[in-house]
Amino acid sequence: MRRTINLAVIAALIITGASAEVMVSATTVESHTDGKSIGLNLWGENKHYTDDLTVNVSGLGVNGNKYHNNVTGIYALDGSQVAIDKNVNVTVVNPAPAESGEKRRPDLAHYYMSGIYAGYGGVTNDGNNDDTRITVQGNAKVDAIGVGLQANKDGYIRILGGADVKTHPLTTSDTYSALSEEGFVYVNTGMDGLKPGAKNVNMYGNIGFINKNYGIDTNPHNHGSEISLGLTTPNSKLVGGVLNEFDESNNNPHHGGLRLYLQNGATWRNEWLGAEREYPTQGRPDTANYLYTGSKVEHLIGGATEGSRGIIQAVDARPITINNYAGHTAIDYEKGAPAAENGKGEVVINHADPGSSVTLRSSVDALKEHANAEIPGLAENQFVKKIVYNGYTKGERNLGVNVHLETGVISPTLNAKLSPDDFDAAGRAMVSNKTVLSTSESEIVSGAKSALASSVMQMRADTNDLQRRLGDVRLNSDSQGVWGKYIGGKSKITDSAYVNQTYNMAQVGYDTKRGNWIVGGAFLYGINNSDYALGSGSGKTAGLAFYGAKQFNDGRYLDIIAKGNRLKNDFTVHNSLGTSLSGDYRNTGASLSLEYGKRIKRNNGFYIDPSAELILSRLSGESFDARTNTGSTVHINSDAVNSAIGRLGIGIGKEAKNSNVFLKAALAHEFSGKMKATYSMAGEPTTNSVVDLKDTWLDLELGGSWSFRPNTYVYGTFTKNFGSTVDTSYRVDAGIRHNF
């Protein structure tokens, strides 16, 4: 066996005289053999790693007549205490996994191959020890053949940060991303497993709870076996089934099992990976069933609201059983998944907290329904039978059930909202005359509509008044000027469409004095990125502008600007079931803005600035084809969008010889701004969408100009609006002007 530790660590230990059991800095441990191979092999030892820990191991679980060589990254037993202040990275390579030979015993294989193992704590054959504990303050990355995180008797594995645990399904024995055998595994859920954090957690592999009531070293069953996973971010995912031998055998007095926080778009794909666990060759002390009949979860805590719910992707045909349920969760049945078949893929909820709900999502095509989707309630009733609420039979009325059933790509979605009494005597959900049935636009249409709104938002982002474009033009003392400025910000729409857009633009211009007029032109180029409810897009815009600004001797001013823009956007949107639509389109925009105001000077350089502005614009319509990931084509025809925005503003400011600062409030109203589109495709009825931008809102603008040289000044504004359909979270204009 070859085993190495970072030389810098060894040198530090020699210089300081410290013991390796006390404190170690950044460390890399390697163990590579053709048989048994363990990176860190700790029996009753204490280790404290103040920096990152990396463990790389390779070995052979089976070699010759040896069928269970231990190939493990970190192996801690007999009350060992391992503290890792930062991150841990464990890689275990094992081309011949344990128990894969001729004389194999697959029920024991998991003992001999783990990324991180903690066990044999408390009273064992080796004496009375402390609990075995491995605590990682940072993130854990584990790539292992076998089990990712394994906690045996009185062993604790606590990952306080995020985790990326990957196992590799085997055909010779069962494998798990996390396994508990009267031990504890907490990932992103604090020291006690009850405090979900906000880190990304990805677990690729089954979850297991083994009842070691057979063979040697049986567990005393003093407490439950627990695994707590905090999947609380959109980038978090669990892939695998959940085996709980205690529930399978109807003997779980400590109510041990999986506590799963599934929130904020995190996903659990319920699909057993690799070989299922076999019955032990040594036999069990009873005739109860211990084998996997479907995932069983002790606690599932969904989102606090429907908007923050997590997602279960039901793949396995066998039922999911949730003993205690709280919050809100979506359950998706995709086309081709065994769970989508009629009578398969049930979700059984034994108890639900008040105010909790589940939302079933699928398509008529995925469910292989023979029912006519045009008959109200028929398809919904068949689908909703997948929910069994046993708490209902005991008097509970806590679980809400919703249904979203896609009837096509662009065809309307069928919706059902069950009443608290819409369950039969056995607790199976059903559609009744109390159920509220409705239809809504499909998620694909909703996404495409949002993508079309991106261009409208980009046009809106390019609007400006005199101060935002040129700063305080009274600082312009020469006949000609050049200027450049940056425009950046964030805006969003959440009413009738969902777009969250950030944009960055650059504009340069040249102008000259003609009497009391400043006339000139400008070129603009910008990019934007948009997030939709289900999808994303990006865009570019380029434009030319011609303007004239007149300054009157009494403080009045008139600003006129005409602009033409060319916009390009591309997008990909999808629905909850995996169907996506991608397309790109181009628009031409034109606008004319007129602003009239007067700076009324007061004492000590203060002034007030009432103003009125009218912005007229038109964004051309576009007809184009977008394609789905299944090869079909959706034709989209968007109408032109006409806009007329009026603004009445009042500003207060203070001017000095070389500077100006101001605060401006403006009441704005959109008199038009209706965006219409039509969607059509083969085999589905044509559908329409409308986004109405007619609205009234308040703009607040803070800015100023400063002449730091006789012929050069800088200027900038910060803008935010309130109460607008197109909500400007912030906008920053920052520029510099040079006169000559």
Predicted regions located by residue number:
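Extracellular beta-strand/loop-rich repeat segments of large surface/secreted proteins
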Residues: 200, 204, 209-386
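Solvent-exposed, glycine/polar-rich loop segments of beta-barrel outer-membrane systems
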Residues: 496-502, 533-535, 568-586, 620-642, ...
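Gram-negative bacterial Sec-dependent N-terminal signal peptides
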Residues: 1-21, 548
